[in-house]
């Protein structure tokens, strides 16, 4: 039994075994020029009656459900009262439920993308390095476990130095619990808009330049407490992972070897390029 989802539907890898309920559709911002996830949808908050009916139906077929993920990208855009209503009903209908999550919840992703204001402006992220640090600081004070995502190559060749230097600085100030580094890949449907909003020629990085950025990020990211670091997304040239600062030297040694042996890199067709 599967719900009649409004596709496309996304969830983090960690939610592969979770039951998914779409309490919102699309993204309320939906202006990041590099992102195509919800461009085919207009943001909407689903009616409680529809969500309730789906919970009722799935609780009959899967009463032992232990994990639930609330989609789409902006479940937390619901009002507090709406969220409480959904959560209370989920725990009522699924007596073995242990965890309910959504994008921007603890241990899920917060897309920083870059710490450089110029890059953030050019990709219409709607944030600055300072505002990102402030938002993350508020979340940390309230007990959130922060998992932050950045995008290698987002500054192109022109802004590669500033992109990585400022991203490492922001990450060091934020002190997240997890960091995921992806590599820029534009869906063909996003290419023209990305280039137009960038407002100047954009040169994509080659694989060696992406490794250079990853190397500089690991070198300059100076967390005060241990941070789980992952560059193992499908878009990455190779899976590099560890805990900073303890595994810094090991990860840098791996990157050095990859530069010497480019044949070890993941073929582009396996990265969706």
Predicted feature locations:
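Auxiliary Fe-S-binding modules of radical SAM enzymes
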Residues: 1-15, 169-273
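Canonical Radical SAM [4Fe-4S] cluster-binding loop centered on the CxxxCxxC motif
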Residues: 5-50
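Hydrophobic faces of well-ordered beta-strands that scaffold small-molecule active sites
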Residues: 19-21, 66-68, 98-102, 110, ...
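Conserved, mostly hydrophobic/aromatic
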Residues: 27, 35, 51, 70, ...
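Conserved SAM/AdoMet-binding glycine-rich loop
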Residues: 59-141
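Alpha-helix-loop-beta-strand connector modules within alpha/beta enzyme cores
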Residues: 83-100, 129-148, 174, 201-224
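Conserved strand-turn element in the central/C-terminal portion of the radical SAM core barrel
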Residues: 107, 115-119, 139-163, 182-189, ...
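Active-site glycine- and acidic-residue-rich loops that bind
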Residues: 108-109, 124-129, 155-168, 208
């Amino acid at each position: 039994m599967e719900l009649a989802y409004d596709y496309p539907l996304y969830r983090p890898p960690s939610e592969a075994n979770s039951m998914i309920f779409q309490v919102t559709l699309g993204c309320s911002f939906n202006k990041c020029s590099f992102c195509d996830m919800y461009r085919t949808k207009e943001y909407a908050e689903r009616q409680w009656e529809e969500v309730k009916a789906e919970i009722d139906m799935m609780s009959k077929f899967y009463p032992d459900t232990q994990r639930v993920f609330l989609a789409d990208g902006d479940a937390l855009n619901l009002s507090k009262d709406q969220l409480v209503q959904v959560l209370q009903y989920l725990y009522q209908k699924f007596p073995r439920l242990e965890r309910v999550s959504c994008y921007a919840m603890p241990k899920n992703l917060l897309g920083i993308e870059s710490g450089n204001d110029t890059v953030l402006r050019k990709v219409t992220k709607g944030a600055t390095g300072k505002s990102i640090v402030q938002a993350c600081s508020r979340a940390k004070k309230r007990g959130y476990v922060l998992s932050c995502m950045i995008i290698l190559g987002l500054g192109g060749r022109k802004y590669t130095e500033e992109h990585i230097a400022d991203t490492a600085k922001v990450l060091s100030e934020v002190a997240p619990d997890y960091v995921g580094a992806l590599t820029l890949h534009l869906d063909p449907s996003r290419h023209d808009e990305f280039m137009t909003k960038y407002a100047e020629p954009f040169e994509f990085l080659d694989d060696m330049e992406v490794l250079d950025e990853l190397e500089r990020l690991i070198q300059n990211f100076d967390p005060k407490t241990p941070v789980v670091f992952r560059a193992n997304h499908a878009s990455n040239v190779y899976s590099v992972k560890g805990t900073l600062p303890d595994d810094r030297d090991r990860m840098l040694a791996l990157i050095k070897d990859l530069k010497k042996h480019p044949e070890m890199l993941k073929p582009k067709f396996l990265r969706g390029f």
